[in-house]
Regions:
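Primarily recognizes the serine-hydrolase "nucleophile elbow" in alpha/beta-hydrolase
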Residues: 1-68, 78-81, 85
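Short beta-strand/loop motif that positions the catalytic acidic residue
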Residues: 72-75, 79, 106
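Extracytoplasmic/secreted proteins, especially bacterial periplasmic and envelope-associated proteins
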Residues: 5, 45, 73, 85-89, ...
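Sec-exported extracytoplasmic/periplasmic mature domains
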Residues: 11, 32, 95-99, 183-187
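C-terminal catalytic histidine-bearing segment of alpha/beta-hydrolase fold enzymes
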Residues: 100-189
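Residues at the starts of beta-strands that form the adenosine-phosphate
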Residues: 18, 70, 100-102
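Short alpha-helix in the alpha/beta-hydrolase fold that links the catalytic acid
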Residues: 83-93, 118
Length: 189
């Protein structure tokens, strides 16, 4: 989770939770969405989803059946750790089925652009699945879409050395965008 989303945290109470988790949480069930069950928030609902650097290169079964709550994705256009292109396609698919979803891209911003402790540059030992395309099988197994075998971090598509780094302009813009979005969504204005 990014430093920016951590700063907003969660507010409890009916219908005012926000989440930076995947936008692909399943529809609410009697016990609540999976993330709500995992974190002990049963009975509460999320008001919005605000993922940063979302990994959109896995196609899940039913991944267009997401919450009716607004989804705002924030991504660096220069992110080569978790590239933005698959998110563009996913947002387009979600929009076509009537979801309230927006992708905001920041030019020249890399992965972790909101972390002021990171200088822009490669992370030589970090693994990235940026060249991998994965799909979910009916039994829940994630497979490599090219090899049709269960995905592992040993697959040839896994690479090392993506770039990371702080971008002050992107951070300031994203911070303002998230604040404004949450003020409207949570009816704080």
């Amino acid at each position: 989770m990014s430093a920016l989303t951590t700063a907003f945290g969660c507010k409890s109470g009916p219908d005012i939770l926000t989440s930076s988790s995947s936008v692909r949480d399943p529809k609410p069930t009697k016990a609540g969405p999976k993330s709500e069950r995992m974190y002990g928030l049963e009975g509460a609902t999320f008001a919005a989803y605000v993922p940063f650097y979302a990994p959109c290169f896995t196609t899940y079964i039913g991944d267009e059946d997401v919450s009716e709550k607004p989804i705002r994705l924030f991504h660096g256009a220069a992110d080569d750790y978790v590239p933005v292109a698959p998110c563009r396609a996913y947002v387009e698919r979600l929009s076509k089925v009537g979801k309230d979803v927006t992708l905001v891209e920041y030019p020249d911003a890399h992965h972790a652009f909101d972390n002021p402790l990171l200088k822009v540059g490669p992370a030589p030992q970090s693994q990235t699945t940026r060249r991998c395309m994965m799909t979910e099988e009916p039994v829940g197994t994630i497979i490599n879409a090219v090899t049709k075998q269960p995905f592992t971090m040993e697959d040839p598509c896994v690479e090392r050395g993506p770039n990371l780094g702080y971008n002050a302009a992107a951070t300031a813009s994203a911070t303002q965008a998230v604040k404004e979005f949450l003020q409207v969504t949570l009816k704080l204005k």
